[in-house]
Amino acid sequence: MNKIRKTFQYGKHEVTFETGEMARQATGAVVVRMGDTVLLVSVVAKKEAEEGRDFFPLTVNYQEKTYAAGKIPGGYFKREGRPTEKETLTSRLIDRPLRPLFPKGFTNEVQVIATVLSVDSKVPTDIPAILGASAAIGLSGIPFNGSLGAARVGYRGGEYLLNPSLDELKDSALDLVVAGTRDAVLMVESEAQELPESVMLGAVLHGHQAMQVAIQAIAEFIQEAGGAKWEWEPPTVNTALEKLVVEKSEAPLKKAYQIQEKTARQAQIQAIRDQLLADRAAEREGEENAVNEHELAVIFHELERRIVREQILTGQPRIDGRDTKTVRPITVKVGVLPRSHGSALFTRGETQALVVTTLGTERDAQSIDDLDGDRQEEFIFHYNFPPFCVGEVGFMSGPKRREIGHGRLAKRAVVPVVPTLDKFPYVIRVVSEILESNGSSSMASVCGSSLALMDAGVPTKAPVAGIAMGLIKENDKYAVLSDILGDEDHLGDMDFKVAGTSNGVTALQMDIKIEGITKEIMEQALDQAKEGRLHILSIMNKVLDKPRSQVSDLAPQYVTMKINPEKIRDVIGKGGVVIREITEATNCAIDISDDGTIKIAAHTTEEGEAAKRRIEELTAEVELGKVYEGTVVKITDFGAFVQILPNTQGLVHISQIAQERVENVRDYLEEGQVIRVKVIEIDRQGRVRLSMKQID
């Protein structure tokens, strides 16, 4: 295969696609370069689909190699290990816009691998990874509906920024990634500083317009490479079986979808499905061709989809009896766990999140070592989705991709209102335990985390709430749904999550399964989401509308002090012996900054004050004329040395011991004796002269 190269200008960056030199045994492979960021993106697909498979097995793996940044991995083995959180999140970011572009009925196994070979600190890797995946799939000839583009959009000084660098993002009020085709937006992922809905929508449209140059370049690159298209035809529909399923199951399914309780509804639907299968098996008894359960399940699912969608588009109540704008009943409790620092139980319909906040010291910060460099995360958010929350039996292991993704979305939503470490000296960990789930558990986590943070006394800027929106669209008819159920998410055309305060949006995530989503539809969804968000906030505010005035007594108690930086060595001691003795004696954690700032984290205020006193004694300066209580440490013929501070001794000359003449120092003093002395002189060398007889 000849080497093919395509270069185009994308904003301020030059982007290059190459194929034909690397990874030539893959079904499709592209090396994409943007600035000095270089990725190899490969795609491999099996030629045959597995019999009876009713889903599309797409796997996307994004992996970072430390050599890309000129680094050697840490740890004993000195090689890359399990995927990092960033790798998992980027894999999901690539997967989400790709998946809806594969044709319905295509069930061949496909794997996309994006490998970072070189990283430029000015160019984040996710945008070139998405572009490379689109180009590689296009080259492979796998059935795929169009070229996919992607763009990052920032917002600073009232202007949108296209593909900003990491440094520019630090000053940006918005970090938004949008992916789409020539005619449609398919995916949005963003974090914002309480921006208006109009600015968010403008960013989406700006990014979609800007990515057209990339979409055109990918199409030209694929055409120039001239890969052969796969010969694939969608599976034909068995019209006779389809008619039979409709006749036998449509009426009972419509009744089943009037059942508002999720578990009962699912049980009834399963019973209808089982009965259909049993009836079909009885009818085919003795025939050579057995019942095709897979074919039956596909038709049954399509019937479910049509029933639910028609019900909504014709103005009938939704599955649980609501109209399109109504939010499910909400209950809120705070302070539900007696020994946690902050907790909240947020229930919305059949979705429930128990969210717990824990406050820790700087030593509890999470160390991150990736291609962007080493850093500390002072705000940690974890989301757990155990199998019992959906009434299932499942294997309990580490967090799955979905849990990591939902946790990051909830974290994005609340980060803009959480104080930085210099304003609130605690490392914060929030854990959301999903106890029940029927749609929008990530948004329940947002609401619960805002409440749990305020319950813990974290001075957040404002309460935050989130809501998941849905869309049902057939031709020109559509309905935007507020607070969607799990079934509405599964059977609908859009999952649109919006979180924010009463002032503006802090996070927006959108996944669209169809084309034809207009600006007007997105505007309506954002406006309807704002209405729902403000409604949820009003309920939350009735229970807790601002942070508690102080942190929990169970949280670490901070005492902060400042010392002369030259005295730091006195506090630490040789080999750390002094500070270790203080921490053990007072049961405190002590952190010292180079500028002399000392943070003492204690279990109680008393322990913190005790540690502070010890440090004050160690760093105190001797004051001329002040009376001290000291210990005699050494006696000589000409006087006695007395320790008046932990690191300071002074001399009481024999002439300063008593009013009368002293012939022998030992007649008046002994080693270990505690006496009161007055500082009468500090010479240029810092030597201290003391007196006993000059004390009034």
Swiss-Prot record:
The keyword Transcription regulation does not apply. Its main location: cytoplasm. One of its GO terms (biological process) is RNA processing. Component of the RNA degradosome, which is a multiprotein complex involved in RNA processing and mRNA degradation. It catalyses: RNA(n+1) + phosphate = RNA(n) + a ribonucleoside 5'-diphosphate. Keywords: Cytoplasm, Magnesium, Metal-binding, Nucleotidyltransferase, RNA-binding, Transferase. It is found in: Cytoplasm. Its EC number is 2.7.7.8. Mg(2+) binds at D489, D495. This is Polyribonucleotide nucleotidyltransferase. Involved in mRNA degradation. Catalyzes the phosphorolysis of single-stranded polyribonucleotides processively in the 3'- to 5'-direction. It comes from Coxiella burnetii (strain CbuK_Q154). InterPro entries: ExoRNase_PH_dom1, ExoRNase_PH_dom2, ExoRNase_PH_dom2_sf, KH_dom, KH_dom_type_1, KH_dom_type_1_sf, NA-bd_OB-fold, PNPase.
